[in-house]
């Protein structure tokens, strides 16, 4: 088996409209397709610079998940940005709290974390 790339990332949200606004209007992802499925509500396919796809799902009453970055399972999603400082200012201007900017001791690159509307940890890393 040979894996070429990550095909998509699936995220289940508790408030579809709030999460849609966050990923589309705040983070700037492009809507590829929005589908309503009566038994499971919405599925939103999002694109990041023509390369990656995030599937945003809404289900009736999804159970909560442990969101600690150190818990088993998916730790966080990380996105590359040109400028950490500009990105943090933008997020803060849009009422999204960010952690203090840190420097990775191995790569010497700047990074920080913030959270989506369902408390999923998201990281931005400077290019």
Predicted features and spans:
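Short amphipathic alpha-helices within nucleic acid-binding modules
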Residues: 22, 85-90
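Mid-chain, well-packed structural core segment of small domains
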Residues: 70, 77-85
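Core segments of cupin and vicinal oxygen chelate
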Residues: 12-53
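N-terminal beta-strand motif that seeds the catalytic metal site of vicinal oxygen chelate
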Residues: 1-18, 74-79
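Vicinal oxygen chelate
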Residues: 1-2, 45, 88-127
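A short, acidic/glycine-rich surface segment
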Residues: 32, 40-42, 61-67, 100
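Exposed loop/turn and edge beta-strand positions of beta-sandwich/beta-sheet ligand-binding modules
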Residues: 5, 40-42, 50, 73, ...
């Amino acid at each position: 088996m040979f894996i070429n790339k990550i095909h998509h990332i699936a995220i289940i949200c508790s408030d579809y409209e709030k999460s849609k606004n966050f990923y589309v209007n705040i983070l700037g992802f492009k809507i590829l397709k929005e589908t309503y499925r009566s038994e499971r509500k919405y599925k939103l396919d999002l694109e990041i610079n023509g390369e990656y796809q995030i599937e945003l799902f809404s289900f009736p009453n999804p159970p909560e998940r442990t969101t600690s970055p150190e818990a088993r399972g998916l730790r966080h999603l990380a996105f590359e940005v040109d400028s950490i400082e500009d990105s943090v200012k933008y997020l803060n201007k849009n009422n999204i709290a960010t952690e203090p900017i840190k420097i990775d001791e191995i790569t010497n690159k700047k990074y920080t974390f913030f959270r989506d509307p369902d408390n999923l940890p998201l990281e931005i890393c400077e290019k």
